[in-house]
Every structure is written in C-alpha cells, then in structure tokens.
Amino acid sequence: SFVLNEKVGPVSCTISQKGGAYKANFVLPKLPTFQAVEPDMDLLGRALGLARNQIGLPGHNCSVCDAGVPYPVVPLSGLKAMGDIKINAQALGSCMETIGRLAEVYVYTTECVWPDSDYHVRMFSPAFGITEDPATGSAAAAFTAHIMEIEKPKDGQQNYVIEQGLEMGRPSRIELKLEVGGGRLQQAEIGGQAVIVAEGHLRL
C-alpha cells in the first residue's frame, strides 16, 4: 500500500496479486458531486452524430459529475447508439458551452457486452486533444455520483463494473466499490488491472 499525492488530494492505493496478475485499488480522496443538467439536445445529437431517440434512457438524466475533475455525463439508448457515435468536435464544444463545460463527454448505457458489466461507457475529450480514451479512471470516479443519484443503492457495500474501450479494440474493465450508509455515499474505490502498452528507458 502507498499514497499518491495528487492535485485532488492524497489517494490511497493498494496493490494485490492473484494468479500472476496485479490489481490496483484507489480510494477516492473526495466524494463526488452530481449536478443535473439540460444540454441543448439538438446540438447534442449533432455533436454525437446520433438521432434524438438514441439519446437518453428512462429515468436517467444528463449530469455533470466531479470527483476532482468534472465530466459531462450523457445516457444513451443502447449498444447500437454507442457504436454509431461520430463526434463533431465543434458541435460538442457548442453544446457543452451551454452547460458551462468544455468539449468533452462521458457517454454510457446499461446494455453491455460482457455479462458481468453494469455499464458500457465511452469518453471523448477533443478539448484536450483526446479523440477517445480506452479507460478513464477519473471519469469512473466521478460517475459514482451519477450511480448514487440514478440507482439509489441500498446501504452497505455495492459493487459495479464498467466496460470501456471496446469500440477502440482496447477493452478495459473498471471496478467500483461503493460504501453506502444512511442513503449516502460514504466512501468509494476504483480498481482494475493493467497491461503494458509501451515501455522504455530514461537516460539521466
């Protein structure tokens, strides 16, 4: 175990090993916040390259969630909508400007590819030069606030699995552990395994 000193605060990290694979779990240094928002839906459709009926899920709102880094969160109708996304960066910037955010978006649906997943997500951030990210831990951390608001989980430990990066051919699995008490989030952890995608040496 060790602590990472990040801008958001000290992040406790625990490394474990099982079957030759290593797993890291991080405790969120601050509880995430949730703010329901209503972006311009016509602009949002243009930004995502989707029809209006592909955006949204019954009982799910658009939001901005923040666990140190704020993310606009948008529900989509299913896996087909997720696969149909064609980002228009200019329209995305105009759309997110209406809710005071930059050109980035974290989209999700409850229809999943893997049977043990709870959410299928994609993250686009042209504002920061990221066409698409295969695994976004900071967004998953923020998304715990959205889960609390939408699902209203019962007290105790609640576990969720997020799948991401499948459309990119770089699948990732992010695990969330929520400690709920009195109907409120008391603590949250994110975790997962990693594989080497690049390596090298620094000459000092």
Could you describe each region identified by the protein language model?
Residues S1-L204:
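Active-site proximal loop and beta-alpha junction motif in alpha/beta enzyme cores
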